[in-house]
């Protein structure tokens, strides 16, 4: 919703009015909403825009727009077990006991990136979509570590890669070349 163009937002604003009527001036027609009409939208910035560059292209939504939304809900990440089930459902080759352990560890890595992001330690976060892509790439390449680097680590700030590699090592039990420990050995 916060990535919409202002001219579109003002059309939506009319629909969000209590009567929800919409006028088509060209046709001299008034459209009345169905009694069960509902409008849902997502907004990563909750209408506040984005000064960090994480959600580039979003706009600040004016207070008049925000006031017309009757319900605003915040959706955080799913519980660990539910996220594991979703990844397994999307990448069915992991539907084994060993596969579930790997997916669980992948979700643990994602959870650490989310905590690190919220604490300001890193600037990139793993979404459930990224975990699914990591699982798919790991399957394609036959290598979980390479899948991680190709899917997520290579997108991260170079200064943060050692910390993110540490997250990986903690959860996956495998050292990456990007980790601080590996760099110290070289």
Model segments located where?
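C-terminal regulatory/interaction module of P-loop NTP-utilizing enzymes
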Residues: 1-186
């Amino acid at each position: 919703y916060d990535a919409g163009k202002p001219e579109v937002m003002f059309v939506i604003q009319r629909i969000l009015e209590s009567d929800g009527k919409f006028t088509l001036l060209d046709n001299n027609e008034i459209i009345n909403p169905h009694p069960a009409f509902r409008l849902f939208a997502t907004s990563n910035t909750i209408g506040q825009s984005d000064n960090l560059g994480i959600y580039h292209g979003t706009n600040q939504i004016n207070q008049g727009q925000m006031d017309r939304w009757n319900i605003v809900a915040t959706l955080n990440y799913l519980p660990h077990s539910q996220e594991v089930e979703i990844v397994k459902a999307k990448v069915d080759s992991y539907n084994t006991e060993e596969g579930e352990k790997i997916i669980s560890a992948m979700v643990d890595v994602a959870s650490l990136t989310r905590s690190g992001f919220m604490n300001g330690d890193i600037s990139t976060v793993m979404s459930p979509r990224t975990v699914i892509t990591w699982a798919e790439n790991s399957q394609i390449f036959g290598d979980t570590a390479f899948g991680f680097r190709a899917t997520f680590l290579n997108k991260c700030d170079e200064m943060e890669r050692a910390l993110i590699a540490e997250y990986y090592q903690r959860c996956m039990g495998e050292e990456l070349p990007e980790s601080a420990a590996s760099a110290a050995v070289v």
